Amino acid sequence: MKFWKSVVGKLWFTILSLVLIVLFILTVLLLEFIENYHVEEAENDLTQLANKVAVILENHEDQALARSITWELADNLTSIAIIQDEKNHWYSPNDKNRLSSITVEQIQHDKDLNKALKDHKKVSKRTGLSDTDTDNERLIVGVPYEKDGKKGMVFLSQSLLAVKDTTKHTTRYIFLAAGIAIVLTTFFAFFLSSRVTYPLRKMREGAQDLAKGKFDTKIPILTQDEIGELATAFNQMGRQLNFHINALNQEKEQLSNILSSMADGVITINIDGTILVTNPPAERFLQAWYYEQNMNIKEGDNLPPEAKELFQNAVSTEKEQMIEMTLQGRSWVLLMSPLYAESHVRGAVAVLRDMTEERRLDKLREDFIANVSHELRTPISMLQGYSEAIVDDIASSEEDRKEIAQIIYDESLRMGRLVNDLLDLARMESGHTGLHYEKINVNEFLEKIIRKFSGVAKEKNIALDHDISLTEEEFMFDEDKMEQVFTNLIDNALRHTSAGGSVSISVHSVKDGLKIDIKDSGSGIPEEDLPFIFERFYKADKARTRGRAGTGLGLAIVKNIVEAHNGSITVHSRIDKGTTFSFYIPTKR
């Protein structure tokens, strides 16, 4: 900052200017006063001397003696002229060599002096009268006198050189004093302005530090005046700012943590439609839309058209708006609420909820109800129909009655299995699966499973193979539950494998457990159905017959049993290539 633009420069210049103006006025007035004072003193002295001369001339009979006495009264700077008329006038000796000499001609040439001479009146005048030698400003005093009836005038002339010399010396001292005063004022003004502005500079530096976020900045308190109070208030302001900024940061961090931990997406939108704040779920939503629109994620700050229209409606109506939209195969519910700044809308906040799982569960629930209704209605209808046939004696022969009774028996068993499966699944999903761990010989266990299905495989012309590679023959698991797992998976593999196909069972020891693979060369499972294959009543083959369908609960039960053993199960499949179910059972510690 330039010196003249600084507070120091302005204060220094202001104080110095005021002092200079005051000194100038005082100097002018003082010089005028001193000069006038000296002139007035000289005039008074000269008037007294003129009166004394007039008295001497009036009181002495011997005028020549009186004049001699008068000449003695005059000093080197004073000249005396005694004039009775144009012919009778006398001058003090050596007047021609004096700067103050005066003649009748000079008096007659001056209007005021000539008038006083004619009227015999007192006169006092400051004037410059030219003679042959010099041009000098003088003080002339005229006093009338009268002797023996003869009137005359006594004129005293005195040069003002002495007065001017005195005034010059006085002026030098005054200017010297003024110069000293100016120098002292300069130093004093600079010192005062620097002392005043030092705390201000510190406050400026402190304000700059505050602007940079250094809220612990303190200003030194050097005085107890208004500037000291200002420094105290500044320090208090810094502490308050530090406190409030910390509180805001804590609230911001808390709000950020809340937003980040929310399962729902949150988007804060400015009044012009630009996005201000988002949380991770909302960012995933926007990224999915940017990807769908082939937009650069870094450059994208727009909303989907549906969300933008909802935002405009919320701002215009000042009411909450809600829509459901599908993006990248996922269902989203979008709730838009206006944000207010005092009395006007300043933007809106959008809450996004991923409803894909809910919609899937709704679909599964509907399918579950439909499947349960279907699975129960079919055997009940058959039981009712064949029972009516027996009651109405429609079966005429014993063979027909046995056939009807067998059908009723089979359907009742089927309905019982469905109910038992539902009860088992409900117990497993509620965490009440009771496992009875015991050491089982894996080879013997697997041989029993193979024998159980070998007849069915042979009947369907399907090759049933197995491969066992174990480090230990015995393993801890629930034999009944694990047999249920193998039964469900092998039964599914055989039912969905055509004649001439194959089903292989592989059991291998892995680190801390067993790895089992059940692979078939059947029809396979569509890729879009793989994520839901372990849901209750989910059927990948929607067109398969009841004979192949089973209850639709087998794989759900399998998954729950495996997970009850702290294991995991996966499935890999390709259409017309076959399916492989792989599950892992950890060693029981």
UniProtKB/Swiss-Prot annotation:
List the ranges whose topology is Extracellular: 32-172
Q: Which UniProt keywords apply?
A: ATP-binding, Cell membrane, Kinase, Membrane, Nucleotide-binding, Phosphoprotein, Transferase, Transmembrane, Transmembrane helix, Two-component regulatory system
Q: Which GO terms describe its molecular function?
A: ATP binding; phosphorelay response regulator activity; phosphorelay sensor kinase activity; protein kinase activator activity
Mind telling me which PROSITE patterns this protein's record contains?
Answer: HAMP, HIS_KIN
> Could you state one GO cellular component term attached to this entry?
plasma membrane
- Intervals, Cytoplasmic compartment: 1-10, 194-589
Annotated membrane topology? Multi-pass membrane protein
Give a short account of what the protein does: Member of the two-component regulatory system ResD/ResE involved in the global regulation of aerobic and anaerobic respiration. Probably phosphorylates ResD.
What's this protein's name? Sensor histidine kinase ResE
